[in-house]
């Protein structure tokens, strides 16, 4: 098993502990919902910092709720781009080398 390729999501309450124990990476998932980058950031940031203690590598999961980077509406695309730029800034802050971004494609709409 190549531990370098395994990342546990912080959605799981014990992900940090297990990642430290087995040498896995951590996927920061607290910002999947964009409001955690805004009004809740002061509360969420120290939690993320604590989870990353003793973790050598991480990925950052960008927000995806109600974001459509492939939208027909250019204002919707602009919002997605703004959120993704902010996610990339946060990823750098936390030392993450990769960012997970969903395309926003919905077959029921397009």
Segments (PLM) and residue ranges:
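Acidic (Asp/Glu)-rich catalytic clusters
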Residues: 15-23, 40-60, 85-95
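Acidic-and-aromatic substrate-binding clefts and catalytic sites of carbohydrate-active enzymes
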Residues: 7-17, 31-44, 68-71, 75, ...
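Hydrophobic faces of well-ordered beta-strands that scaffold small-molecule active sites
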Residues: 4-10, 24-28, 58-62, 99-101
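N-terminal charged segments
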Residues: 1-2, 18, 27-30
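Active-site acidic/histidine proton-transfer and metal-coordination neighborhood
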Residues: 70-110
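Short hydrophobic interaction/assembly module
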Residues: 50-77
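Short, low-complexity, polar/charged sequence segments that are solvent-exposed and flexible
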Residues: 25-30, 45-48, 77-81
